[in-house]
Amino acid sequence: MASYPGPGKSKAKYPFKKRAGLQASAAAPEARSGLGASPLQSARSLPGNAPCLKHFPLDLRTSMDGKCKEIAEELFSRSLAESELRSAPYEFPEESPIEQLEERRQRLERQISQDVKLEPDILLRAKQDFLKTDSDSDLQLYKEQGEGQGDRGLWERDVVLEREFQRVIISGEEKCGVPFTDLLDAAKSVVRALFIREKYMALSLQSFCPTTRRYLQQLAEKPLETRTYEQSPDTPVSADAPVHPPALEQHPYEHCEPSAMPGDLGLGLRMVRGVVHVYTRRDPDEHCPEVELPYPDLQEFVADVNVLMALIINGPIKSFCYRRLQYLSSKFQMHVLLNEMKELAAQKKVPHRDFYNIRKVDTHIHASSCMNQKHLLRFIKRAMKRHLEEIVHVEQGREQTLREVFESMNLTAYDLSVDTLDVHADRNTFHRFDKFNAKYNPIGESVLREIFIKTDNKISGKYFAHIIKEVMADLEESKYQNAELRLSIYGRSRDEWDKLARWAVNHKVHSPNVRWLVQVPRLFDVYRTKGQLANFQEMLENIFLPLFEATVHPASHPELHLFLEHVDGFDSVDDESKPENHVFNLESPLPEAWVEEDNPPYAYYLYYTFANMAMLNHLRRQRGFHTFVLRPHCGEAGPIHHLVSAFMLAENISHGLLLRKAPVLQYLYYLAQIGIAMSPLSNNSLFLSYHRNPLPEYLSRGLMVSLSTDDPLQFHFTKEPLMEEYSIATQVWKLSSCDMCELARNSVLMSGFSHKVKSHWLGPNYTKEGPEGNDIRRTNVPDIRVGYRYETLCQELALITQAVQSEMLETIPEEVGIVMSPGP
């Protein structure tokens, strides 16, 4: 059995050309206090230079390579033409659909079965010409593994686990069910797509599935670098450590004095072509050397998008991925039939651990709607009783008290009810995102939204801070429920970040059960129409320059520096179903030239968010600060290329509904184990009926999915919306206890909580692959389930990587048997 390098054993280089690392100017003596052993030095470069990402570790050319640009342009133009239609633009013409391929294969097999009675040689010729899956060109590695290994099981290193549950092993030839030429072409395309994602994740210091990386290492000319994305705790967590992390000794927003902040690097900042560049002097001129930080090259990004767009509509590749997904679904059903009782028995053996007593993270929830409607109603009534004379609003230059605001609406506390509040989504919001957005206004009045659920208002967000702290108190009381709340930055002015940070610090809005994500609504067209922005680059400057300033000189933004340590990353939000009038390509205007009132396309927002985040992450990593990830809303509606952009650039996504109609992308998301936070109740009110939601299908196939609430104010009724989400899903889809605990474990793995916190919640070995990384005493997920997921993923990765390797190996005699079960 072949051996594979374990995670963390190889120390190697990036698979792309890396720009020079962070260096400091000798003219900036302050830098020494910030970077310690990694001083900054000047390095001459031109603004806009980027690392070369064009070199794959091996030859992955396919038959589509010369046509990628033309295919992608055709798809993008079709997307624009069909944006008015409800049908999605990824439903392509019937040039090579799966049904035709299936019918053709069945006809051939029927013909073979009829002719073999008359002429046995026909069968042999047919196998050689059409079903030549595992013969001449098959894998030398299979040959080495095949003899004597198939009957002994898959995993020699874990004999105990092997005896614990039953497996289904597919042996013999033609296991993937497609012609070998199609298998080879599909495998090369899939591997190429995975390499594309790996290089962008490495470029931005985001995480990449270690199991997938380990298999890609077999194909790389040089081993891929294994990176640690979270700072390890000073003291490792022991195996017997308590499930609850130790309480903080002091509030994290204490010591906000500038004198207590890290030193000033004395670097200059300027945005060039939509990306912030860092210079060695505070006021850079044309000849000032630049501190070189890596960011993606625009030309290569567009080329990579074209490759993936061409890949997802290739007929043979669609057939291959569709078959693999169907196989994964069937295999899971067989696993459940064989091992369900063993999984349940393993859970029952664990003392004081059940679904209620394991950590769950709401990985997709908006802060402005994190409370339920009854909670908001009670808070408004309480405010009307206690703060009736407080000045809360300014209307046309005149200050108004809370009493005057409600008198202008002809309302009293007695008149208010849940029905009057009218914030809950109903049947009228289905496919009407505009009506859904209106539900954010209590009683249909935007002034109440501004007073009660905004951070920037006349009272500096006092009411909103109080209600958020009440939600946090409920989470802390439950002990095992956590949330990642989204706060908004719009990019209309440079001081938005400081106002948001002051709101959090001054009101001490913090909880060990809560992390923050910052969402950026894609509303440039609205701001441009109102004359609030001159061009798109101004919006990018308002979003990212304060973050770079707080990193270079934390004392200049003390509250922001403290706040950013509790921010996980960035989210991109808006109605994805809105038509896009532009295609992002090399002819698209640069951000400083985007002055029209049309909104840039989704990929445009995502690319420039990613590029600036990548630069910022490298700067912050050198200073020892917390880094960020990209976790956008994606795949809820709209065109398929949203999911293509997210596959390349995002660590996790929210929604992902459209993957159900894109088998190639769904298979890629599975192989890369990209987290998908799904909200079935939210989707049920907006885009997709509950019974049609693909979550149970994704879960059975092994995609990294979790349950989330999205907007409890609009969609939920109880005090514990996350438990409500789990309970409804369990009842409707008949999920088992193991399924529910697996979803909860996935939510913790996907979340942005620190490595130390996750070590307490999941166990100190949670970063290890397979059952070794599972602690059933903390997760209540049986090793049987984790082992099944791990083995299945390894087998799928082995199928595609070994098919690619087969081209580089000598011909294998046809009579040699083949076993497709590599060791870990």
Curated annotation (Swiss-Prot):
Belongs to the metallo-dependent hydrolases superfamily. Adenosine and AMP deaminases family. Substrate binds at residues 366, 435-440, 636, 711-714. Its EC number is 3.5.4.6. Zn(2+) binds at residues 364, 366, 633, 710. Gene3D superfamilies: 4.10.800.20, Metal-dependent hydrolases. It catalyses: AMP + H2O + H(+) = IMP + NH4(+). Residues 1-43 are annotated as: Disordered. The modification Phosphotyrosine is found at residue 90. The modification Phosphoserine is found at residues 45, 63, 79, 96, 113, 135, 137. AMP deaminase plays a critical role in energy metabolism. Catalyzes the deamination of AMP to IMP and plays an important role in the purine nucleotide cycle. The lineage of its organism: Eukaryota, Metazoa, Chordata, Craniata, Vertebrata. Homotetramer. This is AMP deaminase 2. Its cofactor is Zn(2+). It holds the Pfam family AMP_deaminase. Residues 10-20 have a biased composition (Basic residues). The modification Phosphothreonine is found at residue 133.
